Each structure stands twice: as C-alpha cells, then as structure tokens.
C-alpha cells in the first residue's frame, strides 16, 4: 500500500514539475519588438474598423536602415486607389 501511495505521489510531483516548466516557458517566450522606437504596426485587419468607402488592407513595408526586413503594415485605405487614410482627417 505504501508503494502504491509513493508511486501516485511521485507521478503527481512530476506532473507538477512539468506544469511549472511549461508556465515558465510560456512566460519567457514573449517576442520582443526588435525596433521599440518605431511605431507599432497592425498585422491584421480582423480588429480594424474602417470608415465608409475604405477597405482594410495589408501592404509590405519598405526596407530602410532602421527596418532592414520586409514587414506588413495593415490599415485603412481608399477603396479606389489604395492610398492610406490620413490619420488626422
């Protein structure tokens, strides 16, 4: 009986260790912004509401010295010419 209790306790203990490791792994697996000085980009149209006669679209960003990689920037565009909507208007 003591052996069965010991086996059950050890199985529970190991499962708790695995749970804690998983939580720590998820906690430290946060992707940091490689360029924190730049404005944050929208990577999806799923949560974006655009005004009438506009559509949400994702355009590739230009490659610059500050951002030497291709990225996507999603936002509202005029539906007839795909020009970005001015933020202040």
UniProtKB/Swiss-Prot annotation:
Keyword hit for Disulfide bond: yes
Localization (cell): Secreted
Maturation and modification: Contains 3 disulfide bonds.
GO molecular function terms listed in the Swiss-Prot or TrEMBL record: toxin activity
Signal peptide (residue range): 1-22
GO CC terms, sorted: extracellular region
Tissues expressed in: Expressed by the venom gland.
Top-rank taxon, per record: Eukaryota
UniProt protein name: U-scoloptoxin(12)-Er1a
Organism: Ethmostigmus rubripes
């Amino acid at each position: 009986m003591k052996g069965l209790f010991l086996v059950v306790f050890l199985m529970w203990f190991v499962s708790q260790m695995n749970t804690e490791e998983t939580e720590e792994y998820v906690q430290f697996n946060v992707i940091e912004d490689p360029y924190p000085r730049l404005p944050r980009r929208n990577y999806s149209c799923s949560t974006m509401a655009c005004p009438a006669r506009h559509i949400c679209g994702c355009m590739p960003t230009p490659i610059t010295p500050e951002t030497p990689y291709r990225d996507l920037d999603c936002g509202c565009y005029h539906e007839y010419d795909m020009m970005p909507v001015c933020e202040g208007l």
